[in-house]
Every structure is written in C-alpha cells, then in structure tokens.
From Swiss-Prot:
Similarity field: Belongs to the UPF0179 family.
InterPro entries: UPF0179
Coiled-coil annotated residue ranges, if any: none
Organism listed in the record: Caldivirga maquilingensis (strain ATCC 700844 / DSM 13496 / JCM 10307 / IC-167)
Entry superkingdom: Archaea
Protein name: UPF0179 protein Cmaq_1008
Length: 141
C-alpha cells in the first residue's frame, strides 16, 4: 500500500529512512496532522520511495522545527521479530505473540503487529528449553 505523507525538505531524499518513535503533542494540534504524522505508526520504520515535486514554494511549515514540508511516498520497512513455532514457511501469514520477545529484543510495544507475513527466515536460536526463529516479517495491521 502506498502512503503519502509530509517530511521536512532537508530529509526528503529517495532511499532515506526514518523511524517514528513518538508523535509529539504539537503534531496533534497541527492542521496538517491528517496528511503528515496521522498516516504513520509510532515505532515503525519507513523508507522514502518517491519525493513528489512541488511547482511552487511549499506553503506547509512544520510547527516543531519551522522547516518547509514536502510530500513523499513512503513504504513501511519490514520488522525483525522472533517467532516461536514448530516450523516456518516463507510467505506464510501467522499471528504474532508479544510474549515471544523474551529472548530477542522487539520493536516498541505499540509497533508490534498482531499478524505478520513471513518474508525471510534469518536464523534459528535457542531460548531456554525451546527454539524460536528470527524472521524478517511484514506487518499486516
């Protein structure tokens, strides 16, 4: 799914990455919230795939830093997650249980999805008396 959002002009370059840690209070009061931070999820990482051109100087200014804002197309980055299942098939869809994060650090709790699509198996590791897979997964929610 294509997501168009706003980012400051100095950061707007194709291939650039950023992570939304937390949405600042000032953003909730901004008239551009719905097309800027409102389209992004805290804790998730994004990659800029396209910078949309503006024919005129941007009328959009960020309330936090005063920078000129430009529209960009972003793609959500995949997450590295532990999955504790008897077997994993790349391309399969599974539920994610945050209790699996005991042996491997996970993204922040608000970034954890309830369902994921397994993109790639990275490793198999032992945790206590059991095993889990470390996978690259695409969040489905």
């Amino acid at each position: 799914m294509v997501t168009v959002t706003l980012i400051s002009k100095p950061q707007a370059r194709v291939g650039g990455n950023f992570r939304v840690i937390k949405i600042p209070e000032e953003c909730y009061r901004c008239k551009l919230y719905g097309i800027c931070m409102g389209r992004l999820r805290p804790g998730r990482a994004y990659r800029i795939t396209e910078v949309r051109p503006l024919k005129y100087p941007s009328p959009y200014k960020c309330l936090l830093n005063g920078d000129e804002m430009v529209p960009v197309v972003v793609e959500e980055e995949n997450l590295i997650l532990p999955i504790k299942l008897p077997y994993i098939i790349e391309g399969s869809i599974t539920s994610f249980d945050k209790s699996w994060c005991i042996c491997h650090p996970c993204p922040s709790e608000e970034a954890l999805p309830s369902r994921v699509k397994i993109i790639k198996v990275i490793d198999r590791r032992q945790c206590g008396s059991g095993w889990f897979f470390l996978v690259e997964a695409k969040p489905l929610d």
